[in-house]
Amino acid sequence: MDPTYERIYAAVARIPRGRVATYGEVAAAAGLPGRARQVGYALHSLPAGRPVPWHRVVNARGEISPRAEPRFGTIQRKLLEREGVAFDASGRVSLARFGGAVRRAKGRGR
């Protein structure tokens, strides 16, 4: 497995239940500032059955990012709602209330 993707998956795994993080926050927490798109690529490549809470990652506007397969957006929203994450009428999560949940791992000196 790509070591960069492993760092991303480890950062996503640190997002607590009922909280979200943006692609950019995950990138920074993985020691990859400015590489939000790489987080998207890594999550798209997540092996089936790998216990990484991919559904807790949203875009910088607090929205579920569009996907080639729309049903995954529906699944993501349902998973977040089951964890107590609320969406407004525009389909956004309040990042002030539910965001900022991922931190950089200790010992990462990059």
Regions found by a protein language model. Give the residues of each.
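Nucleic acid-binding interface residues in structured DNA/RNA-binding domains
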Residues: 1-110
